[in-house]
Amino acid sequence: MRTLLIFSITVVLMSSIVVSQLIQPENEIRTYIENSVPYIGTEIPRMDRIDGTGIKIAVIDTGVDFNHPDLFGWGPDGKVIGGHNFIEENQLPMDTNGHGTKVAGIIAADGNTLGVAHKAKILAYKVSEDGEGVSSELIRKAIEKAIEDKADIINISLGVNKTNSKIDSAVNHAWDNGIFVVTAAGNDGPELKTIGSPGRNFESITVGATYNNMTSSLIAILEIDETQYTVIPMVGSSKTQEPIIEKIVFGGFGKNSDLENLDVKDAILIVERGSDIEGELLFFSIKEMNAAKAGAKALIVYNNQPGIFLGELIHEFSEPGYVPQIPVVSIDREEGLEIIKTIEKKGLGIMNLFYNPDFIAHFSSRGPVSPFYIKPDIVAPGAYINTTQINSSYNFTSGTSFAAPHVSGAAALLLQKNPELQNDEIKSLLMTTVQPVSNAYGQEFSLHESGSGRLDISNAYKAKLIINPTNFVINLSPNQLSIEKQLEIKLIEGELGKINVKFEGPEFIEFTHNIKNNNLLMELNIIGEKFGEHEGKIFINHEKIQYTIPVLIHYTEGSISAYEENEKIFFEINHPDKWSSAKITVTNSKNGNTYSITATPDKKTSLEIYENGEYWIDAKIRVDENISNAFDTIKITSLPEEMKLTNIPEKQIILVILAIIIIGTAGLFIRK
């Protein structure tokens, strides 16, 4: 009896371990027009009566208020022609939160406001009641239902802070079924590596957020002794008529008592956020009034905790009739303390606040998500967007949730104009015809922040070239100093004629090209020894349209190369210094399945593969106590059709085998 009990406990324990590994926990997902719609160029297609007619766009969100006059009607004759309520079965997907209604309005409002594709129809899939959280399983079900309902485009303006294989797999399924999928990047910026699923999905077009029009796109610069600082204008701040060039003065917390014995007349005052008295509410508006009263020309508020923040001067607790008198910006704690620490040594500060709509919103999530592809793909207006709200109202709102529907609407216009377009062709037209986006100092944002650039529907609509791929990630090393790449150019109409090609990037990268059979053949050569990650752009000019193809270059000290033989991938590692080991991670680009293996210099390293596809290879080469990265890609096409007995990943198979061994061993003891 005792041995039988031990055997039973063993079976239960091992089964629970295996099951826990096989079941992926549910992840809580957070939901992340007025001027923005014409700003991105909708007037050009509207002149041709291209308005989204005949296109069905699935909105996976909090539902849609189909009683709103701009989104009126449920059923075949309404704006919202179908959908599903995954929160309350047998109920219509009516929005009681507002998030989904805002998204749908940007896409297809048709009334007092006009969405990007105002004659398109909406499929509403309600996966959240309050906009705060929803399980990944509901997102997956909604995507599958959109496929079943034959949506043309899916808009997903919500996501998680990490990879979610359920959502990514469903997005891939939709993409493979010819449905164009648009995802929001998320609102966890300005830090890098903040894009989660489904925004990190390789196939979907991932959208970050910019400002939009000239009245709500205030940005700021702060320079001290030629050092440039990142500052954010507070909401309600006034702009400067001209740059303010004055001394910097530290004013404690910005109280009257902090300033009464200081000479702050005409100065740029810097103060700390909050108060030195616990529980005291020292609003930014109070700090601004005190600074202006003391004669300061501008105010900087540095954070009282790590990171930067967006402050508001005008709020419900502001004094009646309060109007800010001087420009006010926020800065992160580290930079604020740096300014204060060296304030006596530094010269004059230069502050300027001005309008720039093509500026990445501070909240917009950034990449990278992988060394092998670029995210976000594109940016669009997502700050201070005036759109539809529940209860027949309108409201200003901000977030990448509201940048994504601009792109969904744009895709609808292109698809109406040319119904034969494939997903990668729509993606190309949107991503290669963008406008550049630059920071407050006139420097273009990095690819990890802005992707290809800001959506320009008028250019995408007029474009005659479909160029693929839409960007390149190139891996070079001293072992491989040059690489050849090819751009395929497809004409939508007419003849190719004359095109001009140029490359802008680091001076130590040499670029040559020629055109053959409507293909652009290129060679990039490294002529310097600057290891690291570098960015460039290829520009193609054709019939007054400029096409932009970003290039991300990894120039690494070590290298890894891969080749296929007998259904295995073999790896060769090179490094100028003596290396002891390398951890190699191989990822199937289509399904995300990942495999790892360790290589050493004294043995040949290989990995068995079971399906065709493109594989991304990431090697972390150990040299003494340092780690050196190296990358490669390989495309496998020679394998027979996949005949896998199970879809259980390798780790879980090992656990199952281990369970069988333990159970078998326990059984032997029982028999004895």
What residue spans do the PLM features occupy?
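N-terminal domain-start motif of subtilase-like serine proteases
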Residues: 21-59, 66, 84-98, 260, ...
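C-terminal subdomain of the subtilisin-like protease fold in secreted/lumenal serine endopeptidases
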Residues: 34-35, 153, 206, 326-342, ...
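Structured lumen-facing ectodomains of secretory-pathway proteins
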Residues: 194-376, 380, 390
